[in-house]
Structure formats: structure tokens, C-alpha cells
Design a protein with these regions (language model features):
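Extracytoplasmic thiol/disulfide redox context detector
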Residues: 2-159, 227, 231-244, 276-277
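Cysteine-centric redox/oxidoreductase cores and disulfide-bonded domains
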Residues: 153-250, 254-277
Length: 277
């Protein structure tokens, strides 16, 4: 701002007194060279004044006269960034989709042509909401499957459920899906459990094991697999992909060639599926 004002002052002074910079001649009539130089000085002064006025007026124009233009510019930049992000995600999913599914639990028809990848956390309320929307979609479509990428970001509230469903997938894929639905629709810790952080992880795991037993899983084998390499590999894959795709929170959905951060309704999921190849 200071430099802009200084340039404006210089431009005004140059316009008013620029003639004093011209070389003096003995003739009363100005020479052709002085006339040209005078016009050049005036032109430079006008450019400096016009540029400075524009720079000083632009913030006022953007914020007071036409504030919507700023929002339009921001929205345009965000749309452009999202389009580029979607392009990178699409390219990766097309080449590495099978690898992304290798150790992950799957809901719906495992052989379906259309795939939804969802980064989710069992203790995230928005993830629970979008899970319900996904269940509504799957109930009406046999051409869609949902690949669960367990992005454990809430520590002891998330670790045991995430590991359990991945480990359950090694035992029985259908029961793994059933356990996923159960963990998303029922509480596996209480407000009382939260009062003692030192025992919270153990209490959460104990409750998860009760649910696993309820769906018919071998809980001894489940505990062993939860600490095995396959589970560790899948959790690494989830974190690595989150970093690659710049996923900072849950839920996050990839549907066809589009990415959706946050919980979205069933009709929006349906629309994205209809647009997907």
C-alpha cells in the first residue's frame, strides 16, 4: 500500500512538473525532440497514476462494491483444485483398484461393476451417518460394492474396531461385513468408559470382541490376526493413500471419477454412481 501511494505521488508530480526535466533551448518555440520527450513523460505519468489508482481501488471494489466476485474467485480456484485432485485419484484407482481392495472389508456385491471406496472411522458420527446412506444405496442396487478403508484417527476409540473388521475379513468376508454394520450402528463404549483413559482401549476391545462373537467369529483367532501383518499392512495402505489423496478427515468417499469429503446423502451417492463408468 505504501509503495502504491508513493508511485501515485510520483506520477502526479511527473505529470504536473515533468516539463522541468526537459533540456532548455534558446528558442522560444520547443524543439521537436522536447515535444516528443514531453509527451513520453506525460504518458509515463498517466500510466503510473492509472496503475496506482487501480491498485488502490481494487480492494474496495472487491470487498464493498462487488463482494461476490471474491467468493466466485475462491470457488473457481477450489473447483479447479478439486478437479485436479479427482484426476490424480482417478488415475491411481484405475491402476491400483485391486490392490486397494486386497485386505479391505467389502459391503454389498463383491463382484459388482461399480465401486465406492470410503475412508471411515467407527467412532466418527459423520461416518455413521454416511454408512446409513450407503446401506440405503446398497439395498437398491446390486451393481455396487463399498470398500471399507478403516482410517483410525480417534486412537483407542477407533483402533480395536478397525483392526477387528480387517482381521474378521480373513476369517469370513460375510461376517466381516456384518461386524462392520454392527459397529457402525451400535455403541461399543459408554460415557463411563471415557472417564478412565488408562482402561479405555481394553474396554473398547472387550466390547468389540462381544460383537464379533455375536456374529459368529472365532475371537481367539480374531485377536491373533488383529496383531498380524495383514492387518498392519492394510492400515499402512489406508494411511499412505490418505496422504496421497490429501485426506485429512472422515468420511471421505471415492465414487467413480469423483471424490467427496464429508458425509453426503444417498441421492448424491446415487447420482455419482450413475455417472460412473
Amino acid at each position: 500500500m505504501t509503495w502504491t501511494i508513493l508511485i501515485l505521488v510520483v506520477g502526479i508530480l511527473l505529470f504536473l512538473f515533468g516539463g522541468m526535466l526537459l533540456p532548455k533551448t534558446d528558442n522560444k518555440k520547443p524543439s521537436a525532440g522536447n515535444i516528443v520527450m514531453g509527451k513520453c513523460i506525460n504518458l509515463i505519468a498517466i500510466i503510473l497514476i492509472a496503475g496506482s489508482v487501480c491498485r488502490l481501488y481494487m480492494p474496495y471494489y472487491l470487498t464493498a462494491v462487488n463482494p461476490l466476485i471474491v467468493q466466485e474467485m475462491v470457488n473457481g480456484m477450489q473447483e479447479q483444485q478439486q478437479a485436479e485432485k479427482n484426476k490424480q485419484i482417478r488415475k491411481y484407482v484405475r491402476s491400483e483398484g485391486k490392490q486397494m481392495m486386497r485386505d479391505a472389508p467389502v459391503l454389498g456385491n463383491r463382484d459388482a461393476k461399480k465401486t465406492i471406496y470410503v475412508w471411515t472411522d467407527f467412532s466418527c458420527p459423520y461416518c455413521r451417518r454416511v454408512h446409513g446412506e450407503l446401506e440405503r444405496v446398497l439395498a437398491d442396487r446390486d451393481d455396487t460394492r463399498v470398500v471399507i478403508k478403516n482410517f483410525s484417527i480417534h486412537g483407542p476409540l477407533s483402533d480395536a474396531p478397525a483392526k477387528a473388521v480387517i482381521a474378521a475379513n480373513l476369517q469370513d468376508k460375510e461376517k466381516a461385513a456384518e461386524l462392520t454394520n454392527m459397529l457402525m450402528t451400535r455403541e461399543f463404549y459408554s460415557s463411563k468408559d471415557l472417564q478412565d483413559q488408562s482402561t479405555l482401549a481394553d474396554k473398547v476391545e472387550a466390547n468389540v470382541m462381544k460383537m464379533a462373537k455375536e456374529v459368529g467369529l472365532d475371537t481367539d483367532k480374531l485377536k491373533e490376526d488383529m496383531n498380524g501383518e495383514v492387518v498392519a499392512r492394510e492400515l499402512r495402505n489406508v494411511r499412505d493413500l490418505a496422504q496421497r489423496f490429501e485426506i485429512s478427515g472422515t468420511p471421505f468417499l471415492i465414487i467413480g471419477e469423483q471424490a467427496f469429503p464429508g458425509a453426503i446423502p444417498a441421492d448424491q451417492i446415487e447420482s455419482a454412481l450413475d455417472e460412473a463408468e
